[in-house]
């Protein structure tokens, strides 16, 4: 399972429970699958591997946002990850703005390790992926 570690000062010393599937937000009336491919490309620095995209459904984050996720079997070299950036006030309440990478690294994990690393709200995606790999889903 390919997961991304969030960039920025809040996540420098955090590991378990903060990794995420590459994700983002829809722009206007953008098709959700097109948005997923665009966001993956922006966050990872290159497009997802070619192949059949399999829907893993949706899950709600603590913020209330809903993530729609697709899986694809393929190779992706994490050593070449180059994320886009966003402005963040840092230190907090300082009035200074710094550019922060959305993700600072990506790694491949087996499903058992991914369950420890991924945000709890995204665990349903791992369950659905495992069901599909077992042939029972």
What is each model feature region?
Residues 1-21, 70:
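N-terminal strand-loop-strand
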Residues 6-8, 73-77, 111-113:
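Short loop segments at secondary-structure junctions
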Residues 13, 29, 117:
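Residues that scaffold the ATP/ADP-binding catalytic core of kinase and kinase-like folds
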Residues 15-17, 66, 102:
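Residues that flank catalytic or metal-binding motifs in active/ligand-binding sites
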Residues 21-56, 70, 110:
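The catalytic Nudix box helix
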Residues 58-95, 107, 129-130:
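Active-site-adjacent beta-strand/loop module that shapes the phosphate/pyrophosphate-binding cleft
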Residues 98-104:
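Non-DNA-binding regulatory cores of transcription-related proteins
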Residues 107, 111-137:
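Charged phosphate-binding loop/patch that engages nucleotide di/tri-phosphates or the phosphate backbone
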